[in-house]
């Protein structure tokens, strides 16, 4: 009995690192990713680290820079619903996309506080054309045919239905079942 209580206390106190990141989707054209990158940087993402002298410049690919920018925007907006959609070009990731020299923020406090860059963006000629309308606006939606921002292709199928901190789950279980063991 005492061992069970001790194990439950240790499990409740055990730390657990969890996070949610926003990354650009695979298989999209560079033109679409560039539009998403430009929007995120212009809308307040901290894009300093992906500039040429920044720690996240390499790998110097549009997808890599796009993922950093949309994640920065998502974290700055407090991981709010609809801030990781970007007209379908971005999605949630439960695995940390950080790499050696480039830590991706996992919260608003780690996403920097720089103001949007006002320099003229480089011009790129798209190699493909997209015939459907394309706009990049984060949506909160939810009414009369307007999308709610809930992305149907999350990579983590339990995303909306899991506890963000397993510690809370252990505390609840411990609190619920402790009286049964103490008074039985």
UniProtKB/Swiss-Prot annotation:
Which GO molecular-function terms appear in the entry?
A: (1->3)-beta-D-glucan binding; polysaccharide binding
Give the chief site where it resides.
Answer: membrane
Annotated signal peptide? 1-19
Excised during maturation, the propeptide residues are: 159-184
Q: List the disulfide bonds.
A: 22-84
Q: How does it sit in the membrane?
A: Lipid-anchor; GPI-anchor
Query: Which GO terms of the cellular component aspect does the record hold?
Result: plasma membrane; plasmodesma; side of membrane
- Entry keyword set: Cell junction, Cell membrane, Disulfide bond, Glycoprotein, GPI-anchor, Lipoprotein, Membrane, Signal
Q: Does the keyword Glycoprotein apply?
A: yes
Question: Mind telling me how this protein is modified after translation?
Answer: Contains two additional disulfide bonds.
Biased composition of type Low complexity is found at 113-139
| Disordered: region residues | 109-146
Is Ribonucleoprotein given among the entry's keywords? Answer: no
Q: Where is the lipid attached (GPI-anchor amidated serine)?
A: 158
**Cellular localisation:** Cell membrane; Cell junction, Plasmodesma
Q: In which tissues is it expressed?
A: Expressed in the shoot apical region and in young leaves but also detected in the laminar and vasculature of mature leaves.
UniProt xrefs under SMART domains: X8
Q: Which PANTHER family match?
A: BETA-1,3 GLUCANASE, PLASMODESMATA CALLOSE-BINDING PROTEIN 3
Q: What's the name of the protein?
A: PLASMODESMATA CALLOSE-BINDING PROTEIN 3
